Amino acid sequence: MISDEAERAAVQQDFEARRDTLTQGNLFQVFEQPMSDEQKEAMTFLYAYMPLADIADHPGEFYLENVDYAFKAREEMPWGKVVPEREFRHFVLPIRVNNENLDDSRKVFYEELKDRVKNLSLYDAVLEVNHWCHEKVIYTPSDARTSSPLASVKTAYGRCGEESTFTVAALRSVGIPARQVYTPRWAHTDDNHAWVEAWVDGKWYFLGACEPEPVLNLGWFNAPASRGMLMHTKVFGRYNGPEEVMYRTPRYTEINVIDNYAPVSYTHLRAHETRSNL
């Protein structure tokens, strides 16, 4: 799963530092179970970078089952072998998308979607998953905490952040790299929005979550996105993709993806502080 030795060593170092810090409660007991090298690498990555609450809230077996289903999708879906390990590691393997409660959606969605998409191209599979998402969830505004993917299916509605969380979970369940993209403020109105990007054959495409269109890179927000000042997403781990890195923390990398929506150029500014003699 991590063929680069330096990257593998960095993940292992981050994992060990965290394990050495969190010594109470047998939080890492799952690593005492027999695992394949692939399983152990995936679990090490998840535990190195997932939020602390996720480690404490769910047993290790929950994450191990999700890891197994991620590998199952990679093995059984026709595009599994063409997804690079970097995109698989950062955009398929993680369970969390936003601040939703975690659930068993990966397994449930995979079993429901696999026969629907297995004979499609990767491009068409993304479109078909979004059609399926539209069948399950419609847009309704709300202010509550982001619902989990299965909760959104149960209620059959969600705001844009919930629809995009749900759609990312559905795409990842069948081994398609996906991420939630967020703009905190449009240029034309004092409002925000969240949607989805999916990786197809070396390129990231955008789509309106639960808003199916005949092609990718088409949505009601094409025009406002082309004038937006910030489109960003958070990626678990030390992500070293081609996108502009805005911020790094020990747990995630925040990237700016605005160049997927409009031509961009860079201006370098230097601030000088002038001290007054007053």
What spans do the regions from the language model cover?
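Secondary-structure boundary elements
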Residues: I2-T155, D190-D191, E243
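Hydrophobic/aromatic-rich core segments of domains that either
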Residues: E112-L120, A125-H131, T140-L150, T155-Y247
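Short, ordered, surface-exposed loop/turn motifs in non-cytosolic proteins
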Residues: S276-L278
